[in-house]
Amino acid sequence: MTNKIILALEAEQMTKEIPTFAPGDTIVVQVKVKEGDRSRLQAFEGVVIAKRNRGVNSAFTVRKISNGVGVERTFQTYSPQIDSMAVKRRGDVRKAKLYYLRDLSGKAARIKEKLA
């Protein structure tokens, strides 16, 4: 049983509109990057390989291949650093955690698209 004050604070922080996505989906995350005194948006596009649903502590991991090297980045879902998220493609997978994609490369690492 959690404290009502904590629940109220967490509900207040979870006001951001988050699109519905699941592991296997390809998403584009617009991240706020601060360089010196100016700020800009940087897009990170990849496949969601893990999702952790814990209220305000929710997080998800996105994997992409950049110049032949696998890059993974974990985002806090309700972080103020995330400007926006968009789902580009729905993936058809049977597992909740797609860590096996780390060992695959090229065409073997493709994910089938979910049709309707």
UniProtKB/Swiss-Prot annotation:
Biological-process GO terms, alphabetical: translation
GO terms, molecular function: structural constituent of ribosome
Keyword 4Fe-4S: no
Listed InterPro entries: Ribosomal_bL19, Ribosomal_bL19_CS, Ribosomal_bL19_sf, Translation_prot_SH3-like_sf
The keyword Ribosomal protein appears for this protein: yes
Protein origin, superkingdom: Bacteria
Record keywords, A-Z: Ribonucleoprotein, Ribosomal protein
GO-annotated cellular components: cytosolic large ribosomal subunit
Disulfide bonds: none
Protein family membership: Belongs to the bacterial ribosomal protein bL19 family.
Role according to the record: This protein is located at the 30S-50S ribosomal subunit interface and may play a role in the structure and function of the aminoacyl-tRNA binding site.
PANTHER family named among the record's database cross-references: LARGE RIBOSOMAL SUBUNIT PROTEIN BL19M, RIBOSOMAL PROTEIN L19
Name of the molecule in the record: Large ribosomal subunit protein bL19
